[in-house]
A protein has these predicted regions:
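Basic/polar N-terminal segments that are highly enriched at the extreme N-terminus
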Residues: 1-19, 299-309
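Short acidic, Pro/Gly- and aromatic-enriched capping/linker segments at domain boundaries
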Residues: 9-29, 40-42
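Buried hydrophobic positions in well-ordered alpha/beta secondary-structure cores of metabolic enzymes
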Residues: 33, 149, 211-213
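Structural motif
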Residues: 34, 218-220
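Short, isolated positions in well-ordered beta-strands
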Residues: 36-37, 207
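Feature captures the catalytic cores and cofactor-binding loops of soluble hydro-lyases/lyases
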Residues: 43-209, 222-271, 276-309
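Short, solvent-exposed loop/turn segments at the edges of secondary structure
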Residues: 195, 215-216
């Protein structure tokens, strides 16, 4: 029905397109082209809070990276952390349905559009799906596919701007967390894949393939891959400043107004770095570089009383 050459030109999960979408990432990549953020940063994030990780990217102008209007499969406090595999879907129409199934067939893909994505997952992945908020007949995940996610990703899961089903079965799958919009018993129907590992959207957040997904509580943060190292180090600074600040307030050394300032004075930084070097609680922060903070303390606006975010 459709021109063979046209079908061959259309690609899903296209390595070169993914590389072009993520030019700021300079490190290793997966075979599909997604940025391969080192596992050590994902591991460090498990001990960090949402606000600690959100702050560094927000200050850089990435203000559309969080969505909180979601439900969680498990409410036991488990976090969802991994590398995004993105997919975008639209309501079905017969001609587009035929085209996209022909594209999938030409690439050797089996099953339905949601299965195509699950079949590509590797360890540490999180599937991030825009189902255009479709819940009735929009149940992207159920018991079988959640089991497949566990098998392929080990500790991954999903973020679905749409529905799920078989919740009782899904909850029996260990080490998986899923964020979703609603539950419905209907199987998935009447949808078409628009894009696979391209730009997608989860509510108010924009997501690229390879972004780091950080789900905590009822919300999800999508961290650009090229900022992860800086974000983790910035979050560590926020964490140790909080630990030090709480103690200084309790001891009456500084006021809350002083601790909450965006820019600390040299005296405060001297006390902080000394505390890091001498207190056992500061041991894991001893490799952090505070030169930028000292530069702001010396050359910033002394009248700037803006509080930290």
């Amino acid at each position: 029905m459709f021109c063979k050459n046209a079908i061959e030109k259309m690609k899903l999960n296209d390595r070169e397109a993914i590389i072009e979408l993520t030019p700021l990432w300079k490190g290793e990549r997966f075979p599909d082209g997604r940025p391969k953020v080192p596992q050590k940063y994902l591991d460090e994030m498990r001990n960090m809070t949402l606000e600690e990780l959100w702050k560094p990217i927000y200050l850089k102008g990435y203000e559309s990276q969080f969505e909180g209007d979601l439900k969680t499969l498990h409410d036991d406090g488990r976090k969802l952390i991994g590398r995004a595999v993105t997919a975008t879907y639209v309501p079905t129409r017969p001609d587009l349905l035929d085209v996209m199934f022909d594209v999938g067939k030409s690439e050797g893909r089996k099953g339905n559009f949601n299965q195509w994505v699950i079949d590509t997952l590797v360890e540490g992945d999180v599937v991030v799906v825009d189902m255009y908020d479709k819940i009735f007949k929009g149940t992207f995940l159920g018991g079988n596919l959640t089991t497949a996610i566990k098998t392929r990703t080990k500790t991954g899961g999903g973020v679905v701007w749409g529905g799920i089903r078989d919740v009782e079965q899904m909850k029996q799958v260990p080490d998986v967390q899923v964020y979703y919009r609603g539950i419905d018993p209907t199987p998935i129907r009447e949808f078409v894949m628009k894009d696979f590992n391209g730009i997608t959207r989860i509510g108010k957040a924009t997501v690229l393939p390879g972004d780091i997904v950080y789900g905590a509580g009822g919300g999800v943060l999508f961290i650009p891959s090229h900022l992860v190292q800086e974000v983790v180090e910035g979050a560590a600074k926020t964490h140790v400043k909080d630990d030090f600040g709480f103690e200084m307030i309790a001891l009456g050394r500084f006021t809350t107004a002083q601790i909450d300032r965006a820019t600390w004075t040299e005296e405060m930084l001297d006390m902080l770095t000394n505390w890091i070097q001498t207190d056992p609680r500061g041991e894991k922060y001893r490799d952090l570089d505070w030169s930028q903070e000292y530069d702001l303390a010396r050359n910033g606006d002394p009248n700037d009383t803006q509080t930290m975010l």
